[in-house]
Amino acid sequence: MAVTAEDILSRLKASIQQPVGGDPTAVNVGTVASVGDGVARISGLRDVMASELLEFKQTKSGETVMGIALNLEKDNVAAVILGDYLEIEEGDLVRSTGKIISVPVGQELLGRVVDPLGRPLDGKGPISASKTREVERIAPGVIERKSVSQPVQTGILAIDALIPIGRGQRELIIGDRQTGKTAIAIDTIINQRGQGMVCVYVAIGQKRSKVAQTITTLEQNGAMDYTIVVNASASESAALQYIAPYSGCAIAEEVMEVGVTVDGNLVKDALIIYDDLSKHAVAYRQVSLLLRRPPGREAYPGDVFYLHSRLLERAARLSEVNGGGSITALPIIETQANDVSAYIPTNVISITDGQIFLESDLFYAGQRPALNVGISVSRVGSSAQTKAMKTVAGKMKLELAQFRELAAFAMFASDLDAGTKAQIERGQRLSELLKQPQYQPIALEDQVIILWVAGNGFLDDVPVARINDFKRDFWQFIHSSYAEVGRAIASEKVLSEATIASLRKAVTEFKQTASYK
């Protein structure tokens, strides 16, 4: 049978009208115009959102690398590459995903170590999280919040007594390198066992060995059961270091808004530590300069204040209508030669609700934690302090601040009146009392007991060198002979008349049996 032209034409029409493998979809594709130092300029991409996730297809290896569109210019898009950019070449295809960068969140992340994209780093297998959250999010509004009213017990006597932190607060930890900033944060995480808190530790630009040491410490103290570690170490790209705190905050927001289960209880309070935001600002400066954004003071871009304010404003205490959860943020800033008036420190001080200032001179003098009581402050934490702690710690901060001034003055004065001498000796005893070894948090009831003893003059005849011996032995005596005192303080959170009477009896009895000379 001969095939006619009409047959061929009808078959062609039929094949054209027949659908081919599903519905066709439009894909937004561009090409790499130039690449270097982790930044790619892309031509041909249309309809790209700011901070949109882009997919780079490497021609040589065929592998896919992700990037973020940060500069949307007239004829090209500048993107930072999240990963190995050395294999990306000019002419490689780039596809827009239509998604803003997201991170896995939820129950599955507890006890895990992840990178800022939620990829596991601990060798414990993949994370099967069913939910993701965008890393950038607008902070809760004023109406959605409520005032800070519940304490975060750090277990550090000096902080819980003098600079109390509340759930939903932003409290800056600031000081020179090697003054114990990370130690305070880790101690606080360790003390959250049984306190109904989930902790997120974000390491930005740290050495891998230091992060591994921190994780080991948390594991040894049983703290990884309720902790998530987000790590963008110094060897990672500046882009990954830049998004790390936002990823950690998104993970914490899931806890605040939805909650996770810890030891069979639903927990909606999160504690997040940013260690540290100085390195975060440096990473952002690097990214901005590579994107050719105009530099400002200290070569930081003009929006470096907004970089940290939009992050720290996401820490909040939500109202009961909105679930009543909270995020408490402890950002860390490293200063140079105790200079708190530098650009980044002043920015973060103005954003946060107070600062814990650690001084290298105090640290090397053996005062650890090396807390400078004079310029450390908590603007909202006192309203979250328990009544028992308020009762015993009320005048203590003023006494210590006055002692530091008097001690400096006394160095040049030979004759001191009896009142000044007594005040200096009392200050020395209080300073000694506040010394505390690392990774040994103190329970609230023990803190209240020893501060009541000090505040009522029972330490005035104890030599300064024996204060720590007295403290240790008295706690042991209370736990064995007057355990009901600690239980009453822990449950009632107040110092009742009966509790005070029992305390007075206990300390009198203890001082009759033990001698500290």
From Swiss-Prot:
Location(s), subcellular: Cell membrane
Keyword annotations from UniProtKB, A to Z: ATP synthesis, ATP-binding, Cell membrane, CF(1), Hydrogen ion transport, Ion transport, Membrane, Nucleotide-binding, Translocase, Transport
EC number: 7.1.2.2
PROSITE patterns: ATPASE_ALPHA_BETA
Pfam families named among the record's database cross-references: ATP-synt_ab, ATP-synt_ab_C, ATP-synt_ab_N
Reactions it catalyzes: ATP + H2O + 4 H(+)(in) = ADP + phosphate + 5 H(+)(out)
InterPro entries membership: ATP_synth_asu-like_sf, ATP_synth_asu_C, ATP_synth_asu_C_sf, ATP_synth_F1_a_nt-bd_dom, ATP_synth_F1_asu, ATPase_a/bsu_AS, ATPase_F1/V1/A1_a/bsu_N, ATPase_F1/V1/A1_a/bsu_N_sf
Top-level lineage group: Bacteria
Residues holding ATP: 175-182
Gene Ontology terms: cellular component: plasma membrane; proton-transporting ATP synthase complex
Catalytic EC class: translocase
Sites marked Required for activity: 376
Membrane topology of this protein: Peripheral membrane protein
Gene Ontology MF terms in the entry: ADP binding; ATP binding; proton-transporting ATP synthase activity, rotational mechanism
Chief subcellular location: membrane
Record-stated family: Belongs to the ATPase alpha/beta chains family.
Summary of subunit composition and partner proteins: F-type ATPases have 2 components, CF(1) - the catalytic core - and CF(0) - the membrane proton channel. CF(1) has five subunits: alpha(3), beta(3), gamma(1), delta(1), epsilon(1). CF(0) has three main subunits: a(1), b(2) and c(9-12). The alpha and beta chains form an alternating ring which encloses part of the gamma chain. CF(1) is attached to CF(0) by a central stalk formed by the gamma and epsilon chains, while a peripheral stalk is formed by the delta and b chains.
Role noted for this protein: Produces ATP from ADP in the presence of a proton gradient across the membrane. The alpha chain is a regulatory subunit.
Name of the protein in its database record: ATP synthase subunit alpha
Species name: Herpetosiphon aurantiacus (strain ATCC 23779 / DSM 785 / 114-95)
